[in-house]
């Protein structure tokens, strides 16, 4: 499985450039890895070279919809390893690690900021903006070449700030319950589509509708209180009623009743 999705991906999604590009050794790995990923239908997210286990090269990749399954990581590793062995971007031995972006993922493209609007983010600017380098708040979409952030706990100033995308040094999502729920939903959908493409799961019937996440995540209406049953009519043929009727016919007076 070396080319799982390339034929079904829109070219403009694959070719969208990253806003942040790594320098040095990581850039050399990126120059080799990115063409291979694009040919397979994946996008490069980030490359990190660390001293872990001697030397570890972590290549973070994703599908254009933001998902990345274990099978995807295995396919990328199988295709990329021999290419890196030939080009040899680094002289010493290293351990190659292919991974997904994760739930609290970095945001590296314009489409990332649009896709995760409404979620909590933390931003570190490469160039200070309004005298600050660090921002945290709700991502409120994209406006021109800037992102909108609704800052938390701001007093005596406008909580809304526009941050130029090309001045951002690092941006990532903050782990929340809402983000975890959305990530699980995306992962399950991607897994179903992969199994269907491999013939491991039957396709949905033609009349089946795909679930709308906005509707499924909407609060459910409160149940209406149960309707009280109508009161039973009082009996009119009891012994008391029959005695009263007899007295009425005889002209007797009911001494138990008041005036």
From Swiss-Prot:
Disordered: annotated segments: 186-259
Comp. bias (Basic residues): 239-248
Record flagged with keyword Cytoplasm: yes
Gene Ontology CC annotations of this record: cytosol
Keywords, alphabetical: Cytoplasm, Ribosome biogenesis
Alphabetical list of Gene3D superfamilies matching this protein: Ribosome maturation factor RimP, C-terminal domain, RimP-like superfamily, N-terminal
SUPFAM superfamilies: YhbC-like, C-terminal domain, YhbC-like, N-terminal domain
Annotated localization: Cytoplasm
Biased composition (Basic and acidic residues): 186-195
Pfam families listed in its UniProt record: DUF150_C, RimP_N
Keyword DNA-binding: no
InterPro entries tied to this protein: Ribosome_maturation_RimP, RimP_C, RimP_C_sf, RimP_N, RimP_N_sf
GO BP term, pick one: translation
Superkingdom assignment: Bacteria
UniProt function note: Required for maturation of 30S ribosomal subunits.
Protein family per UniProt: Belongs to the RimP family.
PANTHER family: RIBOSOME MATURATION FACTOR RIMP
Name this polypeptide is given: Ribosome maturation factor RimP
